[in-house]
A protein has these predicted regions:
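Conserved alpha/beta core of the MobA/IspD/sugar-nucleotide pyrophosphorylase nucleotidyltransferase superfamily
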Residues: 1, 166-247
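N-terminal nucleotide-binding beta1-loop-alpha1 segment
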Residues: 1-18
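Short beta-strand-to-loop acidic/aromatic patch adjacent to the donor-nucleotide binding site
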Residues: 98-107
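Conserved core of the sugar-phosphate nucleotidyltransferase
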Residues: 110-190
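Conserved beta-strand segments of alpha/beta enzyme cores
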Residues: 24, 70-72, 155, 223-225
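Short catalytic helix/loop segments, enriched in acidic residues and glycine
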Residues: 20-35
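Conserved N-terminal catalytic core of the sugar/cofactor nucleotidyltransferase
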Residues: 2-5, 31-98
Length: 247
């Protein structure tokens, strides 16, 4: 079992907090965001971990070398003109076993990882069906940032679209999922076959949202198992998120 943390982003909505560091090194309760994910993986028994950096790469490299020496580091040199999915495939060579993918701006406990480890499905996606409570703390209008998700018989049928009504949201995608080793060749095939002349939810292939990429997989394989978040978690996307005390 392996893990990849996607940490190439700038985090512009955190304003001056990312002037001298990547978003993943912004602190929540006096600890860098990425340390929460790394500690969760380690506590769950996953030691084969890679991080893909980009913005302020040397700062991230120095932090990992000082605190998590065994982590393998990859670089997305095109971080300014690409998105999360492209960042993930910068570590493609690392993906040769069951692999959990995590965003670097989310905070969760090791129990989330244990649930993904235990799932035998080809693609398992952590989702939060109790998302609204958190979103009400984060936004005056929760629907302004929430995205759609349709779940049928435990499998995700659709996700990642803007919504105007809460009924379109069975749960919220949190940015944490797993590809089983046996399914990785199919994942690579979907990526390699993206139409370079097409736009995916208004983004070109290099900037395709992760939810749009997962949608491409779902449309072809219909195999995305929903794994429900066992407890509170937190996303840090704006400065006010750092004031939320639920984790």
């Amino acid at each position: 079992m392996k893990a990849i943390i996607l940490a190439a982003g700038l985090g512009s909505r955190l304003e001056e907090l990312t002037k001298d560091r990547p978003k993943c090194l912004v602190e929540y309760k006096n600890m860098p965001l990425i340390s929460y994910q790394l500690n969760a993986f380690l506590k769950a028994g996953i030691n084969d971990i890679a991080v893909v950096g980009g913005y302020k790469f040397e700062v991230l490299k120095n932090y990992l070398n000082a605190n998590f020496k065994k982590v393998k580091l990859y670089e997305n040199t095109d971080f300014a003109s690409s998105n999360m999915t492209y960042t993930m495939f910068c570590a493609r060579e690392f993906m040769d076993d069951d692999t959990i993918i995590s965003y670097s701006d989310i905070i969760y406990d090791y129990e989330f990882i244990e649930l993904l480890k235990a799932c035998k499905n080809e693609l398992s996606v952590m989702v939060d069906k109790n998302w609204l409570e958190l979103w009400k703390q984060r936004f005056s209008d929760p629907l302004s940032d929430a995205e759609s998700m349709e779940i049928q018989d435990g499998f995700i049928k659709e996700l990642g679209k803007k919504v105007t009504h809460i009924d379109k949201i069975d749960a919220q995608y949190i940015g944490l999922f797993k590809f089983n080793k046996s399914f990785l060749s199919s994942v690579f095939e979907v990526w390699d076959n993206l139409d370079k002349n097409r736009y995916y939810d208004s983004k070109n292939w290099k900037n395709i949202y992760m939810t749009s990429f997962l949608t491409e997989i779902i449309n072809k394989f219909d195999n995305a198992k929903a794994i429900f978040a066992p407890k509170n978690w937190l996303e840090i996307d704006q400065k006010t998120d750092l004031e939320i005390d639920i984790f």
